[in-house]
UniProtKB/Swiss-Prot annotation:
Residues annotated as signal peptide: 1-32
Classification lineage: Bacteria, Pseudomonadati, Pseudomonadota, Gammaproteobacteria, Pasteurellales
Key words of the record: Cell outer membrane, Membrane, Signal, TPR repeat, Transmembrane, Transmembrane beta strand
Coiled-coil segments on the chain, per record: none
Organism annotation: Pasteurella multocida (strain Pm70)
Ranges where the record places region C-terminal probable beta barrel: 205-509
Region entry Disordered, spans: 43-72
Subcellular location: Cell outer membrane
Protein name, UniProt field: Surface lipoprotein assembly modifier
A cellular component term, taken from the record's GO annotations: cell outer membrane
Function: Required for correct export to the cell surface of some cell outer membrane lipoproteins (tested with PM1514) upon heterologous expression in E.coli and probably also in Pasteurella.
Family listed: Belongs to the Slam family.
InterPro entries noted in UniProt: Slam_C_b-barrel, TPR-like_helical_dom_sf
Polar residues: compositionally biased ranges: 46-57
Length: 509
């Protein structure tokens, strides 16, 4: 058997890469003698906001894969002759790997494996051959190890993205393709990536994404620090610890229509279970049905939704309470717009309107609606890094004005792929929250003075996540997150610090 070998210099020419990494205390107007109840029974409030997201990507018809088109000096050798020339094997293997020549790699791998091979090149060749032979799980596993070791090796990242697409790992595939777009690529390669994204967007398969977090809470009820005292009054709440699990499941399906339009259904389930403090257990469901338009650079989605929330009761519940009760119901509409300004810059905008109704009579003064607007600008200078800045506005209108407020915030973030397979993500945030009215009338005798003025809060947050890219088990990568929240206020009973540690296991099916 004769083999035509391309003789090229022993250099790696990167042309790709990137992974888009992509509470308020509710207080009562109570006027007890010296103990002022601090109502922390409501679960954490969440605010619609965009942040770097890893979008779902998959493919239908397969775009043409990149292969070598260069004309080089060629020689004809038999397998036996090639086996006696390790230098030629290496000079042939490297271009074959870089240029996605799966047939050439398949021929060269058995020869190279017997010649004191470089472990990295051997693993890369094994990944290519596994993909050619349809062993996609094995191929993806090997490619992830390769990228963890050399995150700037763009040809291998492209091959990983294609393997993920073929393996119908939609979210992961789209994330890798979006990373690759951030590089200064030749026009044909950008066209190739866009063709993959376009065909992936036309997939109509069900997507399931879920995960479990281990929670370690030192102040699950957002209470002021122990020993807080003001004007002779003390809060009724003290920080409580809790340990447990949070869980989430997202089920979604798209139906592609003509000219880039689509309809979409999704269902979200979220919950928290604390085995040593059950009164803070919670559970929620949200159903979304809508549609939109998308192409390789733009996605616009309008999604009406309904939501139900169950809660044991928090501080309003007895110590041994365990039963979840209907807490609130909501309905509204969400508009989500993503647009790539350039291959390196992306802007994401989310607008949401919600009508919320509380089930328990004593909570119905909180009935009302809310508006939120969130904008995030994302910059990806290369395949190993991203930066983002976000601006958020949230307005809550309630029957009782003392519960209504406006919140304005800013977020800054940075994600990085480091050598040795380590990845990190850091986000810092700052927000101001201003309530519409005081929680106590000025002529109320048994209330502290700070209840008689409009409450203003300053809210600070830090989130840091770290994981190892090559640590995978059944497609799951464990991640560790530390989250810190601090609120200062002109109401000392609304000030608190909160440290949380998460251990996250998530997977896309």
């Amino acid at each position: 058997m004769n083999l035509m070998i391309n003789l090229k210099p022993l250099t790696f020419l990167p042309f790709f890469g990137r992974l888009v990494f992509l509470s308020g205390v509710i207080y009562n107007t109570a006027w007890a003698n010296t103990v002022i109840p601090v109502d922390n029974s409501r679960p954490d409030e969440t605010f619609s906001q965009t942040s770097p997201k890893q979008h779902l990507f998959s493919q239908k018809p397969k775009p043409t894969e990149p292969t070598s088109s260069a004309s080089s000096q060629q020689i004809s050798l038999t397998i036996e002759q090639l086996a006696s020339r390790p230098d030629l094997v290496l000079r042939a293997l490297i271009p074959a790997l870089k240029n996605n020549d799966m047939r050439g790699v398949e021929i060269l791998l058995p020869i190279y494996a017997k010649q004191s091979p470089d472990p990295f090149l051997l693993k890369w060749a094994q990944a290519v051959v596994a993909r050619k032979q349809g062993k996609l799980n094995e191929s993806v596993r090997l490619y992830r190890q390769i990228i963890a070791e050399k995150p700037n090796l763009q040809p291998a990242r492209l091959q990983l993205a294609i393997a993920l697409t073929q393996n119908r790992e939609n979210e992961a595939a789209k994330a890798q393709f979006n990373q690759l777009r951030s590089e200064n690529l030749p026009a044909p390669l950008l066209t190739l990536i866009d063709s993959y994204i376009d065909t992936i967007n036309q997939r109509d398969s069900w997507n399931v994404y879920g995960g479990v977090n281990y929670l370690h809470e030192n102040n699950v009820n957002n209470a002021p620090p122990k020993g807080t005292k003001a004007e002779g009054f003390t809060p009724s709440s003290q920080p409580e610890k809790a340990h447990g699990l949070s869980y989430f499941i997202n089920l979604s399906k798209n139906w592609s229509l003509a000219h880039g339009f689509f309809t979409e259904f999704s269902a979200d389930i979220n919950g928290k279970y604390y085995w040593d403090n059950h009164k803070y257990d919670e559970f929620s469901t949200r159903l979304n049905l809508g549609g939109g338009y998308r192409n390789a650079k733009t996605e616009v989605k309008l999604m009406p939704f309904v939501e139900q929330f169950w809660y044991v009761g928090g501080e309003n519940a007895t110590k041994d309470a365990r039963t979840l009760h209907r807490y609130s119901k909501s309905s509204g509409i969400n508009l989500d717009v993503d647009y790539w300004l350039t291959p390196n810059w992306k802007i994401s905008t989310v607008l949401e309107y919600t009508e919320q109704r509380y089930i328990q009579p004593q909570r119905q003064n909180s009935n009302g609606n809310s508006y939120s607007i969130s904008n995030t600008l994302i910059y990806m200078p290369n395949s190993q890094q991203f930066w983002f800045v976000g601006l958020d506005y949230y307005q809550k209108n309630t029957r009782l004005k003392a519960y209504a407020f406006e919140r304005q915030g800013i977020r800054l973030g940075w994600g990085q792929e480091w050598p040795k397979g380590i990845s990190t993500r850091l986000q810092t945030s700052y927000a101001t929250r201003t309530y519409r009215a005081p929680s106590a009338e000025k002529n109320m005798i048994f209330a502290p003075s700070f209840f008689k003025v409009v409450q203003k809060n300053h809210e600070y947050g830090v989130n840091f996540t770290i994981w190892h890219r090559s640590l995978h088990w059944l497609g799951i990568t464990p991640k560790i997150t530390w989250a810190y929240q601090k609120t200062t206020s002109n109401n000392p009973f609304s000030e608190y610090d909160r440290n949380r540690i998460y251990l996250t296991f998530s997977k896309t099916f």
